Structure formats: structure tokens, C-alpha cells
Amino acid sequence: MAPNLRKSHPILKMINNSLIDLPAPSNISAWWNFGSLLGICLLTQIITGLLLATHYTADTTLAFSSVAHTCRNVQYGWLIRNLHANGASFFFICIYLHIGRGFYYGSYLFKETWNTGVILLLTLMATAFVGYVLPWGQMSFWGATVITNLFSAFPYIGQTIVEWAWGGFSVDNPTLTRFFALHFLLPFMIAGLTLIHFTFLHESGSNNPLGIVSDCDKIPFHPYFSVKDILGFMLMLLPLTALALFSPNLLGDPENFTPANPLVTPPHIKPEWYFLFAYAILRSIPNKLGGVLALAASVLILFLAPLLHVSKQRTMAFRPLSQLLFWTLVANLLILTWVGSQPVEHPFIIIGQLASITYFLTILFLFPLTSALENKLLNF
């Protein structure tokens, strides 16, 4: 009998073991769909990004008009740009839900998978930041100025780092050129890191909503989860297309329709919505270096998740107190996101400071304490 090519061919065998005959827990819910959705987001962003790059000019005198030209004169250029800009928002929605799922169900106990995931998040944030600068509108320019300037808070070496990053003494043509180079490179780095993330995941197999070993009850990935994933693709691509077609500028900043002008500062400098929670934490500390450290800590704190796990149970499925705390943390992040979009004045300053304290307090102290209490309650 001839060998099955799918199982014997060196490359097809790898694909088969990852996407077809992969043993998957039978009880994973729709919360496990976001990994594949992130893959589709990445693919969409790379394709639309490549098409945009063919019409873009990375020069301060031409960048803004080249983007306008793409939207006005290129066949479906407006659609490609709108899909790319809003695709970034969907990318972040999916990654935040994916991280939330991992946090709720204790997936962070697969340490290597979790750590590569956090590195992926950081790379995605860097990609989105440099990408936002490329249209060279007012918010692009001032966003780049404000965020790169944060590095000057580091003692002794700070100013040198900033000027090195800028390629001069202010955000100018060299900055735009290198940001375009980085924005082109980073998505491919993300794709490479995704394969590493994938490799680590397939070493241990997927977690499941019960957080128990499911080796005795696994089903093949195809057709069960491949079909479920395709449903997920439809449910994500439909709102993305609707947003790109009906309200493409809903999540953007009107300030970015004005070409960059170093002599006019916008009244409210703020990043895209997906960075607002971190921006709120940055702003809530009156000291520059302190703010920068808090900003970094707000994301890097995810690396500590496996170390802060003290519960005897893996997931929060049967831990009502931790569940309450988890949803409080979600609400807290939504408050931070809202505060980040507001001007720096009373009462937003104090709300931001309280929400920032609560954010760190919840993750670093309240979760471990609650878990310890729940462990005690198990004995009754």
C-alpha cells in the first residue's frame, strides 16, 4: 500500500501534525478561537500592508500626499487602507481577549508559551506605534515626538538614545525612513515568533476550561476545530469589513487629517485607543522617569503571572472570588482606557491615579491573596 503523502512528506507531515491530526481537548470553548483569529489578522495586515507599501513614499514632503493619493487614485486603495488601519484595531481586540482568556483559565502555567506570547504583544505594540507615524499627519508626528521623548527620562544615556532613535535633533525625515523600515520588518518578526509560540504550545498541548489533563479525551483538530475556526473568521471579518466600509474613521483621530506641522501642537495628544490604558498609567505619575517605568511595568507585569499563581486550581472556573476580581480588573482597564482619552484635568487625573494603583494592586497582591483564601476554603 502506498504511504499517505500527508503523513510521510517532510513538510506536509509538519502541517498535518499542527493543523489536521493535532489532538485537541474536546471541551475547548470559543475563547480558544482567538489564536487562529490573530493568525488571520496578521495575514490580512501583511497583505494589505504590502499593497500599501507599493504606493507609499517614506519622505516627510511626500508621505501624507502619497497616502492621500493611494486613497483617491489607486484602484480600491481607500479600501486597502481602511482595512489595514481598522485591521490593527481588530488585531488588538483579539490579542487582548486572547490574553484575558489565558489569564482566566491559567494558561500562563505553560511558561514558555506565555512568555513568547508576551514578547509577541510587545512586538505588536512596537509595530503599531511605528506604523501610526507613517501617514505623517499631526497626531502621527506629535505621537512619535512624545513617545520617543520618553526615553530621555533615563539618566545619563537617555538623551543620546533619543537622538540616536530620531537620527537628528527632532523627529524628521530620518525618523520617518527608519520607522517605515521597522514597520516593514516587524510583522515578519511577529510571524517568526508566532511559529515559536506555536512550537511551545504543541509541546504541552492546549489547556482547557477545566484546567485538567485532557489526554484521555482528545479529538482531531480537523474537521472539528478547523470548521469552528472558519466560523470565527467569518464572525471577525464581517465586522472588520463593515467598519472599513461604513465608518472607516470611527476609531481614528481627526487631527491626523492635517499634515504634520512641528510648529503647531495639537490641543490633546493621545495615541490610538488600544494604547490608552498604558498612556493613562504613564500620565497618572507626575514624575517623568516614574511614569515611563510604570508604563513599562503595565505590560511587563504579564511576565509575572506564572510566579504569582498560588491557587491549587489552575483555572478560575470554580473560583468565584477570583472571578469577581478578574472582572473588576477588566472594568479597571476599561476605566483606564476611557481616562487616557480625556484631557489632563480634574477629575480625570485622580480617577487615572486610582485606577492605576488598583491595576497593580489587583495583579500583584489581591489575586495571590484571594487564591490563598480559596485554598483555605477548599479544606472546609
Swiss-Prot record:
Bilayer disposition of the protein = Multi-pass membrane protein
Might you name a Gene Ontology BP term for this protein?
mitochondrial electron transport, ubiquinol to cytochrome c
UniProt keyword annotations, A-Z = Electron transport, Heme, Iron, Membrane, Metal-binding, Mitochondrion, Mitochondrion inner membrane, Respiratory chain, Transmembrane, Transmembrane helix, Transport, Ubiquinone
Q: Where does a ubiquinone bind?
A: 202
State the similarity comment.
Belongs to the cytochrome b family.
Q: What does this protein do?
A: Component of the ubiquinol-cytochrome c reductase complex (complex III or cytochrome b-c1 complex) that is part of the mitochondrial respiratory chain. The b-c1 complex mediates electron transfer from ubiquinol to cytochrome c. Contributes to the generation of a proton gradient across the mitochondrial membrane that is then used for ATP synthesis.
Q: What name does the UniProt record give this protein? A: Cytochrome b
**Organism encoding this protein:** Sphyrapicus varius (Yellow-bellied sapsucker)
